[in-house]
């Protein structure tokens, strides 16, 4: 269902009472990509910075995306924490990590077009969603978005190195 409220559209996720999307119209500095740039610490004065961006709110215990499903978007966590996990064939769920504010989710799905993990909100959370179909074109038009993607991917790689180091030390 969709309802409009003063330049704000709320669309409930199909088949779910727990997740919903919020689309903000452009027009104020708080709207659009500028909010994502602020979250990630990237200064941008481009007129494209007010381009609308989808905000998705996810209640605690609800999956943002499921392992094996087609990658629809890359997400940046504005508020909240997510658990990333893999489910084995026997149903065993292995926690692979956690992600919090200003971290990116779903970027690892771009190379195989499906999410390799499931991301579940550990608390009521809010994410910015960048549709995969628009990601590269938008990055070409808005260079700051490319910087945000590179910064977030670099942070993820650093985090993985830290985890590998801890595992190697037996900590």
Where are the regions that the model predicts?
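Polybasic "coupling" helices that flank or enter modular domains
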Residues: 140-171
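Cyclic nucleotide-binding regulatory module and flanking cytosolic helices
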Residues: 2-60, 103-105, 109-110, 141
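Cyclic nucleotide-binding regulatory domains
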Residues: 62-123
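Residue-level signal for well-ordered alpha-helical positions
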Residues: 110-111, 122, 138-142, 163
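A generic structural signal for short hydrophobic patches within well-formed alpha-helices
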Residues: 104, 135-136
